[in-house]
Amino acid sequence: MQAHELLQYFRLPELVDIRQYVRTLPTNTLMGFGAFAALTTFWYATRPKALKPPCDLSMQSVEVAGSDGARRSTLLDSDEPLVYFYDDVRTLYDVFQRGIQVSNNGPCLGSRKPDQPYEWLSYKQVEDLSECIGSALLQKGFQASPDQFIGIFAQNRPEWVIIEQACFAYSMVVVPLYDTLGADAITYIVNKAELSVIFADKPEKARILLESVENKLTPGLKIIVVMDSYGSELVEQGKKCGVEVISLKAMEGLGRANRRKPKPPEPDDLAVICFTSGTTGNPKGAMITHKNVVSDCSAFVKATEKALVLNASDIHISFLPLAHMYEQLLQCVMLCHGAKIGFFQGDIRLLMDDLKALQPTIFPVVPRLLNRMFDRIFAQANTTVKRWLLDFASKRKEAELRSGIIRNNSVWDKLIFHKIQSSLGGKVRLMVTGAAPVSATVLTFLRAALGCQFYEGYGQTECTAGCSLSVPGDWTAGHVGAPMPCNFIKLVDVEEMNYMAAMGEGEVCVKGPNVFKGYLKDPAKTAEALDKDGWLHTGDIGKWLPNGTLKIIDRKKHIFKLAQGEYIAPEKIENIYVRSEPVAQVFVHGESLQAFLIAIVVPDAESLASWARKRGFEGSFEELCRNKDVKKAILEDMVRIGKDSGLKSFEQVRGIALHPELFSVDNGLLTPTMKAKRPELRNYFRSQIDELYSTIKV
């Protein structure tokens, strides 16, 4: 066959030929083709699309040149950390001024009474009230200076933010107090920060402060401003010990009659003294500047700018304590974009009711809340069929997650997950978790079930809340993301625990404009946290993963040795054991003269009965806690999970004692940030510890 004949043989059909062929097809066939084409077009137009990552997810951080192994975010164009995202936002005063502009004086702060809708103050109203309060402070003789400290002793509410903005407008510094610190710690902070004025939300808190003055423990306190109504006896109690008790309304009136022009702060001025509740000793006052907060806020905006455009229509639910930098940072992000902040009623038991009423788009959480949500969802799947459906649906959505797809409109959302999403108000598009480790199983399931962008961050007060964050598009769990654009992270050797930076493991150290100035009037503690080159030593042990993300694998603090010389990090072990279904809390204990570990275990009151029943045990919660066979079964389950999680044999506990009462702030066994107070736990359970060591033979 000649070449031209071959080409003619394989030629494409002419349009006339196609028309002729189509005319010969039956009508049903043509309709089928049309339907198929329409369906294909519809699928192509509506198919779920993966969120485009802002960087190569296989390389989320890179080494900084000449920095001894420090890594930075690949979202940066150079080896200089990000300080500001918006040119006109350098301080927290600037943050609020920008919020006024971009919201067009929209709603700012909202609150509600029981069974009532939210009522809102506009941005201009908040500015007006804050300037009145700030002017009143000046009229009372306080200085518009970063050396002037103002105490706030209140739950989250609009007045909290108004008073804080008053401080920022006149270059004053906020010192938050919270009742779970305990009376002794509050007294310590009042004296350490030399607080002469404190804003309290309730008369009960004012009485706590007055009693301290009456007992000559806080002689410097001169004014208490009370937000809620109170009786004349409180005023009289104050007069007797030389303290003026005045209402917030009266302060507003005083400031309105003596209005002063704001005196905005500089970026390097102090903004907040955030006292961290240590597990031992007195709390430490972390000195946080305006630049610290704004740089951390800017880094969050930079990291999410392509995936999440925050705007004035967004609504944030405020229930995590404003006394902590985590909530402070998130509110900074919201106010900077003119968003709305709605406050919970003050009772965590009513949070779900508040969520339904507010319908937030932004929902910050902590692992405790996520664990509770996860447990309740699976507790409701109480039949084999329900559990199978839940598992099947979550697996389908988790497969989409691995492809980078985030959505809440799939068939599985409509059939299975819609109720869960509606319980949060039905409009959540962003969730952030931090403050403590979260199980990869819990995080992956809730990312799938809730169908929103769900970021995990890591940090501490001393780096203004966050130093690493998930990158948009990377919805894998088991790590805490890449360095935030405002800071570098490096790992340093911890030889006693056999962690070497050369092997990609070591203590996590942070450097950048978000790192604090030091601890208030405590150079010794400051020197322990900040080295001479400005690196913050976190006390956490991290590991670099191949894609440039950071995984927290251990804890340097609280480590101890067993008799054979093995180093033990109890918090790592506790975080593994609490994954056991019947376990709510664990305190792992060891001693240098003992060769093995033991633990005090608080069973989960909600799940213990059903878990025990499946294994043939019956009885009340207290009876099950006393049952030796139940204790043995719980220990076996803990050891199984420990083995699956890679615990070494010497890291496994050899015996446990069951305790029916939760460790709590009220009984003195937890800090206000829900961390174990290990010395107190040791003393409290001394008899059980001694008994375990005397009865267990290895």
Curated annotation (Swiss-Prot):
Instruction: State what protein this is by name.
Output: Long-chain-fatty-acid--CoA ligase 1
Which InterPro entries does UniProt cross-reference here?
Answer: AMP-binding_CS, AMP-dep_synth/lig_dom, ANL_N_sf, LC-FACS_euk
The reaction(s) annotated as catalysed by this protein in its Swiss-Prot or TrEMBL entry are:
a long-chain fatty acid + ATP + CoA = a long-chain fatty acyl-CoA + AMP + diphosphate; (5Z,8Z,11Z,14Z)-eicosatetraenoate + ATP + CoA = (5Z,8Z,11Z,14Z)-eicosatetraenoyl-CoA + AMP + diphosphate; 3,7,11,15-tetramethylhexadecanoate + ATP + CoA = phytanoyl-CoA + AMP + diphosphate; hexadecanoate + ATP + CoA = hexadecanoyl-CoA + AMP + diphosphate
Q: Which residues carry this modification: Phosphotyrosine?
A: Y84
Q: Which PANTHER family match?
A: LONG-CHAIN-FATTY-ACID--COA LIGASE, LONG-CHAIN-FATTY-ACID--COA LIGASE 1
**Sites bearing N6-acetyllysine, chain numbering:** K356, K386, K632
Spell out which residues are annotated as carrying 3'-nitrotyrosine: Y9
Record family assignment: Belongs to the ATP-dependent AMP-binding enzyme family.
Q: Which GO cellular component does the record give, naming just one?
A: mitochondrial outer membrane
* Annotated PROSITE patterns: AMP_BINDING
Give the location in the cell: Microsome membrane; Mitochondrion outer membrane; Peroxisome membrane; Endoplasmic reticulum membrane
Its primary localisation, in coarse terms, equals membrane
Q: To which species is this protein native?
A: Cavia porcellus (Guinea pig)
Q: Which residues are glycosylated?
A: S135
